[in-house]
Swiss-Prot record:
Subunit structure: Interacts with ced-3 (via large subunit p17 or small subunit p13); the interaction inhibits ced-3 autoactivation.
Protein name: Putative inactive caspase B
Pfam families in UniProt: Peptidase_C14
InterPro entries, per database record: Caspase-like_dom_sf, Caspase-related_regulators, Caspase_his_AS, Pept_C14_caspase, Pept_C14_p10, Pept_C14_p20, Pept_C14A
GO biological process per UniProt: negative regulation of apoptotic process; positive regulation of apoptotic process involved in development; proteolysis
Entry's Gene Ontology molecular function annotations: caspase binding; cysteine-type endopeptidase activator activity; cysteine-type endopeptidase activity; cysteine-type endopeptidase inhibitor activity involved in apoptotic process; zymogen binding
Taxonomy, superkingdom: Eukaryota
Reported consequences of knocking out the gene: Survival of touch neurons and several pharyngeal cells is not affected during development. In a ced-3 n2427 or ced-3 n2427 and cps-3 n4872 mutant background, no extra pharyngeal cells caused by impaired apoptosis are produced. In a csp-3 n4872, csp-1 n4967 and ced-3 n3692 mutant background, pharyngeal cells, that are normally fated to die, survive and 16 percent of animals have still 1 or more cell corpses that are morphologically apoptotic and are internalized by engulfing cells. In addition, apoptosis of the male linker cell occurs normally.
Lineage: Eukaryota, Metazoa, Ecdysozoa, Nematoda, Chromadorea
SUPFAM superfamilies: Caspase-like (SSF52129)
Entry comment describing in which tissues the protein is expressed: Specifically expressed in the hermaphrodite germline.
Amino acid sequence: MMCEDASDGKKIDETRKYRNNRSSKCRAIIINNVVFCGMEKRIGSDKDKKKLSKLFERLGYQSTSYDNLKSSEILETVRQFTQSNHGDSLIITIMSHGDQGLLYGVDGVPVQMLDIIDLMCTASLAKKPKWLMCVCCRGDRIDRAVRCDGFIDNFFDRFPKFFQFMKSKFPSHQTSSSQADLLVSFSTSPGFLSFRDETKGTWYIQELYRVIIENAKDTHLADLLMETNRRVVEKYEADKVVIVCKQAPEFWSRFTKQLFFDV
């Protein structure tokens, strides 16, 4: 069966699209870690949680938020969620401190990304599109932009506690998965910091929210994420005075079809 894409008049093969009807009562969860033991508070993350809750509701998802979970609680929350009824698709968002291949519970104990991915690859979720969104640092490297007019050399000296924390990490572990129908998006590149504005939230969620609100009606998820990546990468290029840091999100996909939202 073929239908027309309203955005450009192209024909879309319905067999190449995942079924994703809001009537199926799709579900999403948001894990929002802000206050940690021995780590800095993630001020501004509540702004992201509010944006995502609003966004998921508009996309037809029943969303539930969980704040300040320990490492064991993160795994148990994901386990219970993946074993419940989630409609045609599901979304899991985790916002926390992190490093390569892992993220942290508020108790400072790391959770391996591979363990979370394994929980999402269950028999009950076979052939259902699953989106895991990770909003966290993936290392302590800084993507510095080069600009010859007005670069602030002492920018990093103004946040000594933050960067001192980012240099003291648990051992990292790189993860991967070959399971189908799973897409994982990251707010930054492997090894790099993910930046967060204390009054507006993370760069990534700010742009992701705008992109999906503007384009979800006729654009599938992979293209929405690609546009989000572009906007985050170019976020401060229009600033003619100072450019200090840059950020490049990424995603990898094992989707076998296109995922459109029922909006």
